[in-house]
From Swiss-Prot:
The gene is prsA. This is Foldase protein PrsA. InterPro entries: Foldase_PrsA, PPIase_dom_sf, PPIase_PpiC, PrsA_foldase, Trigger_fact/SurA_dom_sf. Keywords: Cell membrane, Isomerase, Lipoprotein, Membrane, Palmitate, Rotamase, Signal. Its main location: membrane. A lipid is attached at residue 20 (S-diacylglycerol cysteine). GO terms for cellular component: plasma membrane. A lipid is attached at residue 20 (N-palmitoyl cysteine). PANTHER family: FOLDASE PROTEIN PRSA (PTHR47245:SF1), PEPTIDYLPROLYL ISOMERASE (PTHR47245). It holds the Pfam family Rotamase. It is found in: Cell membrane. It is a lipid-anchor. It is an enzyme of class 5 (isomerase). It catalyses: [protein]-peptidylproline (omega=180) = [protein]-peptidylproline (omega=0).
Length: 305
């Protein structure tokens, strides 16, 4: 996420390219620097060219997909990032040279690009089948984390003598008594729901959890870097079929494509060509040639994963 912040911070330069003219940007005892002089200097740099590329892309994306990205969608993503960083959110923004407003602007740009990918990428049956192999639907679990394996075994022994109807309440008591996870021990050990795409949980933990049916718990302690876990499955809808999860599988493939430079290049090329872009400054005529020259020969199809 921090890398993402830093990458977006560079886009803040976009404001410097707007409304260039004779107004003064800065003064010194050696003379003044006008907007036009600043523009002439900046446009010759790679950063300046990248900024103009982004400005153009934002314009055409907004025109083509603006009605598909709502204000609430931007706010939802913004709140997610804010929640991830908690009390350090403001400092991370500051270190990246961004404000809350500029972050929301770039979130919108990213969501617009995602709409373009969805519109220009064809997800094949083969890709759906491959994605389904590792797919697990969203599940809800509770866990008890302890530092010693013997303690976890004691908890499991207790659960074995517990009736199924009393399992959740007993697990809640044991979590409060034994768990070292302060964030969940007083909540019955319950974690936020997750699926196979979740990256916040230990892979060993997820693998053990996905094997459980609703109401089942791990028969042996699950060892991770944090200690030993006893996991109780609160709700597992089952894997089901590709047809049942086609929408979610497609979404996951599109999310993967958002990190695929080849797919993004081809999508941007199509979007720019459709945008009828015309560069008026002769010195910048070729800044989009890498995209526009390839748009007629490159097809935007989802990459094979």
């Amino acid at each position: 996420m921090k890398k993402w912040f830093i990458a977006l911070a560079g886009l803040l330069l976009t404001v410097t390219l707007a409304g260039c003219g004779s107004q003064t940007v800065a003064t010194t005892n050696g003379g003044k620097i006008t907007e036009s002089a600043y523009y002439s200097s900046l446009k010759g740099t790679s950063s300046g060219k990248q900024v103009l590329q982004q400005m153009i892309l934002n314009k055409v994306l907004e025109k083509q997909y603006g009605d598909k990205v709502s204000k609430s969608a931007v706010t939802k993503q913004f709140d997610k990032y804010k929640s991830q960083y908690g009390s350090s959110f403001s400092s991370v923004l500051s270190q990246s040279g961004m404000t809350q407003s500029s972050l929301k602007t770039e979130i919108r740009s990213n969501l617009l690009l995602k709409e373009a990918v969805k519109d220009n990428v064809t997800v094949t049956d083969a890709q759906l089948k491959k994605q389904f192999k590792s797919y697990e639907p969203e599940v809800s679990v509770a866990h008890i984390l302890v530092s010693k394996k013997s303690t976890a075994q004691t908890i499991i022994k207790d659960l074995k003598s517990t009736k199924s109807s009393d399992m959740t309440s007993e697990f809640t008591k044991l979590a409060k008594k034994y768990s070292t996870d302060t964030a969940t021990k007083n909540k019955g050990g319950k974690l936020s729901s997750f699926d196979s795409t979740d990256t916040s949980l230990d892979s060993t933990f997820k693998k053990a959890a996905f094997k459980l049916k609703t109401g089942e718990y791990t028969a042996t302690p699950v060892k991770t870097q944090y200690g030993y876990h006893v996991i109780l499955m609160l709700k597992n809808p089952g894997k089901g079929t590709i047809k049942e999860h086609k929408a979610e599988l497609t979404k996951q493939i599109i999310d993967n494509d958002m990190n695929d430079s080849t797919v993004l290049h081809n999508v941007v090329a199509k979007v720019l060509k459709k945008g009828n872009v015309s560069i008026k400054d002769n010195d910048l005529k070729n800044i989009l040639s890498d995209y526009l020259s390839s748009s007629s020969s490159s097809s935007a199809s989802s990459s094979s994963k």
